[in-house]
């Protein structure tokens, strides 16, 4: 399953670079490790879209292998548990997806949320949803 990088680059290039302590909820959670060659040289990437309708999708690139998932999420105390078992939580002001520190950006507009929902719909159509 391949999602064109041009659809994901807006998430990566135009997001604020600082993580702010705020309650976790709908928005984009991401981590990117760039290689020495710049923009197209992505070594590791994790992008998770958590939608307000209890749906989520994620795309990861680790060791040049792509993976994706889509499904439902649940709030569990002060964390969010994705249907694939991954937990988003905040510790000492930093947001984590499992053990990986990530940036969290709440949706700034309805247009941004709708764009993320479209990306999730495409990922869901190309992967088996987790339950």
What do the predicted segments below correspond to?
Residues 37-79:
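N-terminal glycine/threonine-rich, aromatic-flanked beta-hairpin/loop signature
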Residues 97-131:
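C-terminal partner/receptor-binding element of secreted or periplasmic proteins
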Residues 63, 79, 94, 125-127:
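Secreted/processed peptides and extracellular or luminal domains of membrane proteins
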Residues 1-5:
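N-terminal secretory signal peptides that target proteins for export/translocation
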Residues 7-17:
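Sec-dependent N-terminal signal peptides
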Residues 22-44, 71, 75, 118-131:
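Tryptophan-anchored aromatic micro-motifs
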